[in-house]
């Protein structure tokens, strides 16, 4: 019995072998996963975490695929993708408990259905709630740390809620315990003017359409903004707005967005990222930090010149998926 057979036997849920990942990411780049798993519930998620630990199989977590770049060679081991809905979702007053796999785009409407507001900043953000909670996603209207009260974390030993105050939330990051995976997210909202909330979200969406390249595959902002600066302005200032490598390009619309013109490779994308970091560092003395999480089997030469966050696989709670399992059958 292979490790993939054993995981399928031990973990209730969906299991796809050699699953293409490019269609499951926002930038539409990357190779396949050895095994893509979608556990049926929290118990199955813990069973998966136990199985990969005992079998020595690497694990990566894929949310909605935003801010994620998958290697051209794909991802070794298991790629975990949570269901859009988990048993145990609930609404109690202004408190909502939602699956980490829930698409962000649906959440404001779900809150509005209960007369609640406070998630307007999520209206234009792609991906899943768990990914947004892990990276403290946000816009000019707010960020996740403003509404998250607790995260339910799954480990090989089970699941349990951890208060947000214990997770070290900061700009575009939080500190999850090693090996933990977000299963559900608890947010605290408040009653308010739903019509005004919807109008604010429409206004923000229109602004994004006018200023961001939303008509092409992109993982969103590539770099975090340095203190007192804008990464897009820096990339444009060093002459890279509209610069192309292969079929990837620094967008002519917004210079902090890499877009896929069709058939781009991860190597194309990383070449643009390395070039921008080098030029900005040389001219301004600023070391740009990526928002993009790398997943999979990258070559060492592709990772040269990247900041530690990207080269290590980025987002908390997931391995990079670049190490081969004991056998890959």
Swiss-Prot record:
Keywords, ordered alphabetically: Cell cycle, Cell division, Cell shape, Cell wall biogenesis/degradation, Cytoplasm, FAD, Flavoprotein, NADP, Oxidoreductase, Peptidoglycan synthesis
SUPFAM superfamilies (alphabetical): FAD-binding/transporter-associated domain-like, Uridine diphospho-N-Acetylenolpyruvylglucosamine reductase, MurB, C-terminal domain
PANTHER family found in the cross-reference section: UDP-N-ACETYLENOLPYRUVOYLGLUCOSAMINE REDUCTASE (PTHR21071:SF4)
Enzyme Commission number, as recorded: 1.3.1.98
One Pfam short name: MurB_C
Stated family: Belongs to the MurB family.
Species classification: Bacteria, Pseudomonadati, Myxococcota, Myxococcia, Myxococcales
Protein name: UDP-N-acetylenolpyruvoylglucosamine reductase
Main location: cytoplasm
Pathway assigned to this chain's UniProt record: Cell wall biogenesis; peptidoglycan biosynthesis
Catalytic reaction(s) noted: UDP-N-acetyl-alpha-D-muramate + NADP(+) = UDP-N-acetyl-3-O-(1-carboxyvinyl)-alpha-D-glucosamine + NADPH + H(+)
Gene Ontology annotations of biological process type: cell division; cell wall organization; peptidoglycan biosynthetic process; regulation of cell shape
Cofactors required: FAD
Bias-annotated ranges (Gly residues): 311-320
